[in-house]
Amino acid sequence: MKQYIEIIDVVARQILDSRCFPTVEVEVYLEDGTVGRAAVPSGASTGIYEAVELRDGDKDKYLGKGVEKAVANVNDTIAEEIIGLNVLDQAYIDKTLIELDGTNNKGKLGANAILGVSLAVAQAAANYLGMPLYQYIGGVNAKVLPVPMMNIINGGSHADNSVDIQEFMIMPVGFDCFERAVRACAEVYHALKKTLNSKGYSTGVGDEGGFAPNLKSNAEAIEVILEAIEKAGYEPGKEFFIAIDAASSEYYKDGKYVLEHEGKTLTAAEMVDFFEDWVNKYPIISIEDGMAEEDWEGWKLMTERLGKKVQLVGDDLFVTNTERLKTGIEKGIANSILIKLNQIGTLTETLNAIEMANRAGYTAVVSHRSGETEDTTIADLVVAVNAGQIKTGAPARSERVAKYNQLIRINEELGEVAEYRGRNAFFNLSK
């Protein structure tokens, strides 16, 4: 097998994501006929420091959300630069893409154009070598199946209801294998549907497959989930814990946190009190974006108060960016980073962020976006880096289920080598 295999063509197209908006799909062709394909996701609640997702802005097409400019950038500018390069040199190709763009936020070519190429290159290389993507990226030590962080009640910008908090999730930490954990999550999901029906609530779903009922309060979301866990025959606080994504940048206004549906306007300290009260009352193991992306002082306070007993995940805070993560580590802020490929724009930069987090004792949670496709790259990525946690929606809607099904296949392929760490995935929390 050759150690230098040339890229001979790169083709991008506009396809649809799960929210019926266009996104970029890229195919990379190699000299021996091998092809790699990848599709790029898109977020609903986006951090202001994320790499730029290039949209056309033509209101006559797809409400201005078209990606024909990004597609043209791949088919013309990027293709010209990377045709002839060695597909097996991912780091060099990603460096070439970054330099070709020349901006610090990928605003010229678009992170959606660059990421599509970066991921398609990796897939083409794995296909050429005849190995699974997780093994190509992670090598022989890639063997940890993740604890799912399943979003089963949607609120905030992921739903049209009376809940301020964006996501309420279940984490099956009390099981000894991935497949058993997924089964338990599916059973809780069905139990939750019955529970909501019995209370007269809607069981329509949000962007990520979770239910979006018009609950009376944010706390009621947790309470109906705990009821569903018990109805499914499991024990909250033992087999299942709760994770929330507060997405608090969405309701941070003029230095205050405005919980519209609660009728409350809170200071940073009061917001920390709010979460601390929940942590003391409910089996919560993870809080994502509990403070706004600009509220470093609030984050510091929250970390001091809750950082030993709860995973505090920075999403909008860190945006998968090593510079922002480095600042957070130096200031002792948060203890975990959410990893979203399209926030930074290349596979290499994503791997660098995960490595930096691990060195600092932070956990890394590999994540989907609300606008997804059938692409399963993140399922392979989470195993490749042994991250131990994945956030990819409810066990419903095929663009979410595709990731879980890929993980089931990987689990089967790894066989006895596969590890499922459960509660031990939270290695930096006190037991």
Curated annotation (Swiss-Prot):
MF annotations from Gene Ontology: magnesium ion binding; phosphopyruvate hydratase activity
Family: Belongs to the enolase family.
E.C. numbers: 4.2.1.11
Organism expressing this protein natively: Clostridium perfringens (strain 13 / Type A)
Residues noted as binding Mg(2+) in the record, renumbered to the chain: 245, 288, 315
Gene3D superfamilies per UniProt: Enolase-like C-terminal domain, Enolase-like, N-terminal domain
Enzyme class: lyase
Active site: 208, 340
Binding site for (2R)-2-phosphoglycerate: 166, 340, 369-370, 391
Protein task: Catalyzes the reversible conversion of 2-phosphoglycerate (2-PG) into phosphoenolpyruvate (PEP). It is essential for the degradation of carbohydrates via glycolysis.
Localization, UniProt: Cytoplasm; Secreted; Cell surface
Protein's name in the database: Enolase
InterPro entries xrefs: Enolase, Enolase-like_C_sf, Enolase-like_N, Enolase_C, Enolase_CS, Enolase_N
High-level lineage: Bacteria, Bacillati, Bacillota, Clostridia, Eubacteriales
Record field: transmembrane: none
One GO term (biological process): glycolytic process
GO cellular component assignments: cell surface; extracellular region; phosphopyruvate hydratase complex
Keywords assigned by UniProt, alphabetized: Cytoplasm, Glycolysis, Lyase, Magnesium, Metal-binding, Secreted
Cofactor(s) listed in the protein's UniProt record: Mg(2+)
Cofactor note: Binds a second Mg(2+) ion via substrate during catalysis.
Catalytic activity line of the entry: (2R)-2-phosphoglycerate = phosphoenolpyruvate + H2O
Pathway assignment: Carbohydrate degradation; glycolysis; pyruvate from D-glyceraldehyde 3-phosphate: step 4/5
